[in-house]
Amino acid sequence: MAQYAADAIALADHLGWKSFNVLGISFGGMVAQELAATYPDRVNRMVLCCTSPGGDGGSSYPLHELASLDPEVRAEVSLGLSDTRFNDQWFLDHPEDEMYRRPVVVTGDTEKRRGDLLQLEARRYHDVWDRLPNVTAEVLISSGTFDGIAPPANGQSIASRIASSDYREYNGGHMFFIQDRSALKEIVEFLDLD
């Protein structure tokens, strides 16, 4: 995570940005935590969505354990983790959610697969828990009630360690910002505050 955060700072330096707002979703939220804990003077406001601090604050579901599964089986398991309500009956009762059921199966691209595995390894060892009090930015932490990848308790843990933070929970899973129409509006409003 430290390298991802350093890359973000290098890009900001190249663009001439002394400080900036940050939006981190899932793995990006892990990177954002590392960024704000390591470079607190660079982050003005930050939104963390469906993410985890690692360590004693709670880790996200160990997705690396699914890497060896057949791609279609992995997609089916991932679906249930992404929203714990998703089962056959749910999709019968909520046909509008059928799009979530279509598995994204990527095969044949060895560089993509290699990148995915390296990302899984990075998140496997993510732990910024002890350094979260270093974060000085105003932070909105948001979780989906039915997220089986980054459970709400993990977002609440993050909020407990950052002095200037607000925790909100939305009706949805790991993609709550698509499922709950109020989420994106509130995220944008938070980032637009002076």
Question: Where are the model-predicted features located?
Answer:
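Short alpha-helix in the alpha/beta-hydrolase fold that links the catalytic acid
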Residues: 128, 137, 151-160
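Catalytic active-site module of serine/aspartate enzymes centered on a nucleophile-bearing elbow/loop
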Residues: 164-194
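Short beta-strand/loop motif that positions the catalytic acidic residue
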Residues: 135, 141-143
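Flexible "cap/lid" loop of the alpha/beta hydrolase fold
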Residues: 33, 37, 44-73
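Gly/Ala-rich beta-loop-alpha elbow adjacent to hydrolase catalytic centers
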Residues: 24, 28, 32
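Conserved alpha/beta-hydrolase catalytic His-Asp/Glu region
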Residues: 57, 78-124, 131
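Active-site loop/oxyanion-hole signature of alpha/beta-hydrolase fold enzymes
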Residues: 1-23
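Acidic catalytic loop of the alpha/beta-hydrolase fold
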Residues: 145-150
